[in-house]
């Protein structure tokens, strides 16, 4: 069963646009939004397994230039 998570991302000053463009293209990213509030970008990420989801977040998302912090919220129920 696929797993999904919302990843809330804070970027460095003046890096939001570039980070957003890079993140939106990553495999597994289903939706990407720039937002107001304490975070700058929110992603919906899907993967086949929890392990694969972790790899996407740790290796790909956190590797994008300009990201200063992430918070991941794994979904437990979808309706």
Locate each region found by the language model:
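A compositional/biophysical signature of low hydrophobicity enriched in polar/charged and small residues
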Residues: 1-79
